[in-house]
Amino acid sequence: MTNKTITLNLGPQHPATHGVLRLILEMDGEVVNNADPHIGLLHRGTEKLIEHKTYLQAIPYFDRLDYVSPMCQEHAFALAVESLLECSVPRRAQFIRVLFSELTRILNHTLNIGSQALDIGATTPLLWLFEEREKIMEFYERVSGSRMHSNYFRPGGVAEDLPENLLEDINKFIEQFPSKLNDIENLLNENRLWKQRLVDIGVVSQKDAMDWGFSGPMLRGSGIAWDLRKSNPYDVYDEMDFEVPIGKNGDCYDRYLVRILEMYESIKIIKQCIVKMPKGQVKTDDPKLTPPTRGKMKESMEAMIHHFKLYTEGYDVPIGETYKAVEAPKGEFGVYLYSQGGNKPYRCRIKAPGFAHLQGLNFMSKGHLIADVITIIATLDIVFGEIDR
């Protein structure tokens, strides 16, 4: 008697695929023999579009890649442009960037843990964590005018200084947030059903994690303490005191714990940013990069012309190439820029962490049940804006 396998299409409209993932599963009963992800359904040609935009006009495209953690991607692009321009960034702007990068990490991890719990069948964590996410989105809105696509980080600094009382409100948020995280831990950490669904599921060894190019919680969950904020610090991360949480077994449960612990570390970094926040400018004083203030534009025709030309023609970037990466919530997000000396990039290559993680889905899900595939997709923390680009 021969074993007959069946082919099952999971997605692209299934809610548990976290986007437009079409997963072709080869099944032996309920056991997965092979998982073949088909991507590209959200491809928008972002890298090509950026070639036809000025460096300033390119920033909003980065918000729309991993739209769950937009500011971290703006950060990578801003660092890459600054590297080519060899411009300095005011210290206040660097602290603001680090502050909002860590708020963005919390924004990302709360959604991941909440949606992962929902996929498995627990509704409560999602509702609790969305209350906290709403508060961070209000901080986004107050600083940039937008809840999601912020367009806030700029080459040479940030778009605007922090509004009045914002630091006090962020401080109030991080004072009460650990108790909410503690509630989630009490609900899930030793929960029998939660552990049955996560422990020993989707195990990634240290060798596999390295071979497949994993980064972020996917790498640290396997016990490798690699974090760009420590190994290759940017802005003022070298002045921050924080730990890099790592797992032991490389399973879904360890990756969940790593994300929980990372949020506690983000709180520590945010506190340090608030305490150490210096006074001063938030944009470089180079007039080629920084538009004149509204006050100056009301007084000077030259300032008005300067503002108009800056936003229509942009600024020229010297010939050269660079690669800059940041420790985004999902892993290493990198931007390779190649300039031929004009006001638009000749080439902008984007390295998204989720792309490498999704390729590992096949070996992670082999031999598991179809219900476990849902858990593994959730632990990958994939967003198709950055994978398909």
Swiss-Prot record:
Protein name per the record: NADH-quinone oxidoreductase subunit D
Chief subcellular location: membrane
Family the entry assigns: Belongs to the complex I 49 kDa subunit family.
NCBIfam families referenced in this protein's UniProt entry, alphabetically: NuoD, PRK06075.1
Molecular function GO labels: NAD binding; NADH:ubiquinone reductase (non-electrogenic) activity; quinone binding
Record's bilayer topology term: Peripheral membrane protein
Record has Endoplasmic reticulum as a keyword: no
EC number in record: 7.1.1.-
Cell compartments where the protein resides: Cell inner membrane
Reaction it catalyzes: a quinone + NADH + 5 H(+)(in) = a quinol + NAD(+) + 4 H(+)(out)
Domain of life: Bacteria
Subunit structure: NDH-1 is composed of 14 different subunits. Subunits NuoB, C, D, E, F, and G constitute the peripheral sector of the complex.
The keyword Aminoacyl-tRNA synthetase belongs to this UniProt entry's keyword annotation: no
PANTHER family documented for this protein: NADH DEHYDROGENASE [UBIQUINONE] IRON-SULFUR PROTEIN 2, MITOCHONDRIAL (PTHR11993:SF10), NADH-UBIQUINONE OXIDOREDUCTASE 49 KDA SUBUNIT (PTHR11993)
Gene name of this polypeptide: nuoD
Keywords: Cell inner membrane, Cell membrane, Membrane, NAD, Quinone, Translocase, Transport, Ubiquinone
Function text: NDH-1 shuttles electrons from NADH, via FMN and iron-sulfur (Fe-S) centers, to quinones in the respiratory chain. The immediate electron acceptor for the enzyme in this species is believed to be ubiquinone. Couples the redox reaction to proton translocation (for every two electrons transferred, four hydrogen ions are translocated across the cytoplasmic membrane), and thus conserves the redox energy in a proton gradient.
Short name of any one Pfam family annotated for the protein: Complex1_49kDa
